[in-house]
Amino acid sequence: MGRSLKKGPFADAHLLKKIEAQADNDKKTVIRTWSRRSTIFPSFIGYTIAVYDGRKHVPVFVSEDMVGHKLGEFVPTRTFRGHNTDDKKTTAR
């Protein structure tokens, strides 16, 4: 179930403040954030945002196709190590 249209998209205020500060200084450094729930706005395009995955910050370069999605969608939190392989061969009884 999606967010109500009357509420509009959400982004943490501290993240918006960091992006506006970089836009004013014309600098593009990596922005570290823990806010996986923030929606990507068009003003985020071209910036690299390091999103926390529970262990480390993973850099995500924001492109035009990502607008409207959440930051957490692009950084998986679980590592899949594959299914257990059984190399047991059938033996004659």
From Swiss-Prot:
One of its GO terms (molecular function) is structural constituent of ribosome. GO terms for cellular component: cytoplasm; small ribosomal subunit. It comes from the Bacteria. The keyword S-adenosyl-L-methionine does not apply. InterPro entries: Ribosomal_uS19, Ribosomal_uS19_bac-type, Ribosomal_uS19_CS, Ribosomal_uS19_SF. GO terms for biological process: ribosomal small subunit assembly; translation. Keywords: Ribonucleoprotein, Ribosomal protein, RNA-binding, rRNA-binding. Belongs to the universal ribosomal protein uS19 family. NCBIfam families: rpsS_bact. Protein S19 forms a complex with S13 that binds strongly to the 16S ribosomal RNA. This is Small ribosomal subunit protein uS19. The lineage of its organism: Bacteria, Bacillati, Bacillota, Bacilli, Lactobacillales. The gene is rpsS.
